[in-house]
Amino acid sequence: MTSAAMWLLAVQGIIGAFDTLYYHEWRARLPARGAIAAPELKLHAARDFLYAVLFGTLPWVAWHGVWAVVLAAILVAEIAFTMADFVTEMSVRRSLGDVYAGERVTHAVMGIVYGAMIAVLLPALSTWSQQPTALRLAPAAVPAALRWTLVVMAVGVFVSGARDLYAAARLPHADWPWTVNRAM
């Protein structure tokens, strides 16, 4: 695993955390928007669970053989969910006047970083795909602090995805700590 891929993944995690906490939670208060936000929240949850796998495994595990194909499918699925999210946001955010301008810029930067990460990850994926099928413990050649930071990010993004899924299901107290006028 290249160190560049790990650093780009960390940058993606930092920008993604900012996007989630500032735009999705604070500004748009998506979990409190009820049924109107459910489609967007479901997409966010799906992406979050994929990112939890990436953050939790890439710093530690080599995806050999068929597992390299599974990893490639996860990477492509994230792109598909992101594209669907772009379309879904238009209807969900209509009552807010659209997606915030800064949020659009944030999403563009995240797309660029993700693309760069995939580009530097492709040689490893190619090598891994030629190996016998196995998930092998192979800590990335980066500082241990970075590997453990990515594990913390895996936990954080998993919790965020669970929150979004909980809110999309409109379960009790899913809007905490927010309240909004849902008639907006």
Residue ranges and their predicted role:
Residues 1-7, 53-71, 120-148:
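Helix-coil boundary and interhelical linker segments in multi-pass alpha-helical membrane proteins
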Residues 13-22, 75-92, 153-170:
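Transmembrane alpha-helical segments that form the membrane-embedded catalytic/substrate-channel core
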Residues 18-39, 172:
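Membrane-interface helix-loop junction between the first two transmembrane segments
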Residues 31-45, 97-105:
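Juxtamembrane helix-capping/reentrant segments at transmembrane boundaries
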Residues 44-59, 108-119:
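Core segments of transmembrane alpha-helices
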Residues 65-137:
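Membrane-proximal helix-loop-helix units in multi-pass membrane proteins
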Residues 103-110, 140-154:
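Individual transmembrane alpha-helices with interfacial aromatic-anchor signatures
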Residues 170-184:
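Short, highly charged, low-complexity non-transmembrane loops/tails of multi-pass membrane proteins
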